[in-house]
């Protein structure tokens, strides 16, 4: 319900900036004193990876919104879940890391569950589905590189801070290029922006980053696929869908 009066780029730009503002005092209080100790390892790698995960998150979000103009919700929901099998495949080819066989049954069950949950068996393949698959690639890369950066640098809030700022800036640029900027529309969506910005754009992504310090990318992707289940329950309970 957050894009009734403003476009998706502007919505993401504002909500991720809200997330940035919310995280900033937590960073100053909890992590600022640890920066020198952590970044002495390889500051260039830290900022490169933190910037990259922001770009991946922006591209995943943007392509998901664009694809909905050319496909339906069931297709988008199902093909987005493709990031689950993409994670171990990309990890293997990019970093030559072998994936334990026990992960694959769970990956297959995730795809099967997504197939049933989204009613994809009643869907028709559309031209926008390729965009959704590309979107899933960026979600997979986001999960993988979050795992890489947090395992080397114990600065989850700073990583989240950089990520939200990158997404906000790129989204605002997208809004300027592709949308009409409606300031009054932002105020009309105040509650939705605050909700999505504080809980999702801010805290949820930092919790993801923190959690991935102790878990490899493939199990992380499997766990994150529960988003579809929770979204279905929330849509039924909160929106009567």
Residue ranges, per PLM feature:
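Hydrophobic transmembrane alpha-helices of multi-pass small-molecule transport proteins
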Residues: 23, 99-119, 136-139, 171-172, ...
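Membrane-interface helix termini and inter-helical loops of multi-pass transporters
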Residues: 1-8, 35-39, 66-70, 115-127, ...
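C-terminal transmembrane-helix exit sites in multi-pass transporters
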Residues: 22, 26-27, 83-105, 229-241
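Loop-to-transmembrane alpha-helix entry segments
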Residues: 44, 80, 96-116, 125-131, ...
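Hydrophobic/small/kink-forming positions within alpha-helical transmembrane segments
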Residues: 54, 58, 62, 85-89, ...
């Amino acid at each position: 319900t957050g894009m009734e009066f403003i476009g998706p780029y502007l919505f993401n730009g504002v909500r991720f900036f809200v997330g940035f503002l919310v995280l900033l005092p937590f960073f100053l209080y909890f992590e600022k004193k640890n920066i020198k100790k952590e970044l002495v390892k390889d500051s260039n790698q830290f900022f490169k990876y933190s910037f990259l995960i922001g770009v991946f998150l922006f591209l995943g979000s943007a392509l998901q919104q664009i694809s909905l103009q050319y496909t339906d919700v069931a297709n988008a929901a199902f093909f987005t879940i493709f990031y689950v099998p993409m994670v171990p495949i990309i990890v293997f080819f990019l970093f030559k890391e072998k994936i334990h066989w026990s992960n694959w049954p769970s990956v297959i069950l995730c795809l099967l569950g997504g197939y049933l949950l989204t009613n994809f068996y009643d869907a028709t393949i559309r031209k926008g589905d390729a965009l959704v698959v590309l979107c899933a690639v960026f979600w997979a890369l986001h999960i993988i590189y979050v795992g890489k950066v947090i395992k080397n640098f114990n600065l989850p809030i700073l990583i989240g801070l950089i990520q939200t700022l990158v997404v906000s800036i790129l989204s605002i640029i997208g809004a300027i290029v592709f949308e009409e900027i409606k300031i009054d529309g932002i105020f009309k969506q105040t509650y939705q922006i605050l909700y999505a910005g504080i809980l999702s754009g801010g805290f949820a992504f930092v919790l993801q980053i923190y959690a991935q310090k102790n878990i490899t990318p493939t199990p992380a992707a499997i766990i994150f696929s529960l988003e579809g289940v929770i979204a279905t329950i929330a849509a039924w309970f909160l929106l009567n869908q």
